[in-house]
Amino acid sequence: MRKWMILLAAVLMLLAGCGKEPAVAGLSDEEFHQYFAEDYARPVSNITEITEENGGLMLKTDLGAPITAMKDGTVAWAADIGWNYGYGRLALVQQEDCYLLYAHCSQVAVKTGDTVKQGDKIGEAGDTGHTEDGIRVGVYRFPLEDVALVTGADGTVSAFTVNGEVSGIGME
């Protein structure tokens, strides 16, 4: 009987270790604020890695994780469909002194013209466009009066220009 009890205890200990791996804790606030000023909130709660690419940052996180506004602003362009020149579904939010780009969303929860407050839902992290799971965040600082949105005949925004030059997003 004692052998069976020891065997049962050993099996139970082995099974206890077969559960799901614990979630990665993610980047600390200190690590996050190496990339963003203190007044910027995290756009997703579980950032596991930040990589710099093409003038923006790729924030690796769980597919479908809620994306929230890093600062207050107005949605200048929201695209919940299409490839959008490799950026996939995206939202471009105008701040007081810059634009914030949230790209590669699995879905976008805002529309062009919406006002967002820091912490409001923008969409969900995805893998649309040319990327892996996560979101791309870009901070574009240029005089806002130099920016023009490019609209089609139906009034939908398809890109933007800075001083007449096509920006890094929206167009090739």
Pin down the residues of each PLM region.
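Zn2+-dependent peptidoglycan hydrolase active-site motif and core
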Residues: A69-A109, D133-R136
